């Protein structure tokens, strides 16, 4: 295939996706993807796992005529990389999550804003940033949302930069240039009174009020403002006294959607209080079933406890054993012993 791509590139210009299957197992991926990026096509429940031939499920699902056309239009994007143009297609979990989130967004915005769209919990390494990109594209192009503004909020500069890089590389798919906020003044100039459109990136700390114990100034009361928060499980997204309260002051009629790669307990009232209930769950178990994540094993080791007196005896024996050695050899051995010693637990005598 690589030889054909190199020698007859025109042969693949109209290719939408590649399928590899032996009937029982099937994988789908783009022409520029490595094999590790090929995935099965499933429902989010995984009910069909081990009960149906994967090829049959893929043909009846992804290759259903209406879904296939929609997938090509809305879930395929191109990014310019150093090695050339890369074609990216959505995994089934990204497709289902973005579709469900769009529907929930339309419902919440139609209720005059202040909506809790929900939470997308997709495990680490599952392509969360691309899921956000696909969803932003769907939201931006949806006519019923009247050219909305999407604000992507993170709590760290490095995370903000990573997400912005992904979105910026996908600007042709988004049909607009994303904007990264540099400081508080830039935030106000970009968002104050903004009438429509835009994909804006900012760290949440920029929404702090200018003076302590005061409110963040109103930037827009539009109802079609969508705030996407990454790592939404973190405590700063508290609507009462966290940063989410300042976001709410700035955009009182906005709708919130949270993304997280960390499990959220049902007792986590704050996260669901700000963002709403779960929209999509792609946990570690599902990722392992898709061979996207390697199994994680925990081998419990019970360490033998050593008393302080015993440790002192060992120290003395060590000094005696190394007495005739060169200083360099002794120091090297001491460093090794100190590392081992730090792993031992001591009990009181």
Task: List where the protein language model places each region.
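Conserved motor-coupling elements within RecA-like helicase/translocase cores
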Residues: 185-200
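Structural recognition of the conserved hydrophobic beta-strand(s) that form the central parallel beta-sheet
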Residues: 20, 200-202, 255-260
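Conserved RecA-like helicase motor-core motifs
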Residues: 171-185
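Conserved helicase ATPase motor motifs in RecA-like P-loop NTPase domains
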Residues: 124, 250-266
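Interdomain helical connector at the RecA1-RecA2 junction of SF1/SF2 helicase-like NTPases
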Residues: 269-348
């Amino acid at each position: 295939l690589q030889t054909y791509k190199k020698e007859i590139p025109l042969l693949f210009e109209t290719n939408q996706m590649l399928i590899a299957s032996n009937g029982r197992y099937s994988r789908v991926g783009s022409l520029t993807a490595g094999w590790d990026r090929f995935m099965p096509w499933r429902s989010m429940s995984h009910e069909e796992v081990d009960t149906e031939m994967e090829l049959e499920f893929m043909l009846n699902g992804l290759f259903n005529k209406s879904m296939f056309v929609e997938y090509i239009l809305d879930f395929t994007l191109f990014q310019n990389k150093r090695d050339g143009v890369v074609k990216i297609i959505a995994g089934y979990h990204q497709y289902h999550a973005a579709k469900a989130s769009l529907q929930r967004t339309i419902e919440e915005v139609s209720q005059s804003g202040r909506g809790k769209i929900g939470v997308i919990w997709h495990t680490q390494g599952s392509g969360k940033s691309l899921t956000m990109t696909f969803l932003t594209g769907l939201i931006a192009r949806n006519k019923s949302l009247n050219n909305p503004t999407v604000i992507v909020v993170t709590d760290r500069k490095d995370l903000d930069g990573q997400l912005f890089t992904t979105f910026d590389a996908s600007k042709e798919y988004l049909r607009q240039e994303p904007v990264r906020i540099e400081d508080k003044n830039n935030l106000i100039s970009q968002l104050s009174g903004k009438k429509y459109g835009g994909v804006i990136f900012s760290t949440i700390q920029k929404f702090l009020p200018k003076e302590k114990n005061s409110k963040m100034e109103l930037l827009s009361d539009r109802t079609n403002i969508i705030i996407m928060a990454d790592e939404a499980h973190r405590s700063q997204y508290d609507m009462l006294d966290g940063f989410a309260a300042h976001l709410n002051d700035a955009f009182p009629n906005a709708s919130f959607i949270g993304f997280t790669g960390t499990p959220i307990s049902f007792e986590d009232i704050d996260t669901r209080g700000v963002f709403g209930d779960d929209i999509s769950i792609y946990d570690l178990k599902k990722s392992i079933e898709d061979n996207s994540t390697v199994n994680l094993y925990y081998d419990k080791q019970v360490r033998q406890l050593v008393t302080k007196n015993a440790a002192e005896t060992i120290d003395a024996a060590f000094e005696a054993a190394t007495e005739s050695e060169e200083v360099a050899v002794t120091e090297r051995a001491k460093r090794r012993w100190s590392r081992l010693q730090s792993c031992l637990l001591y009990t009181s005598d």
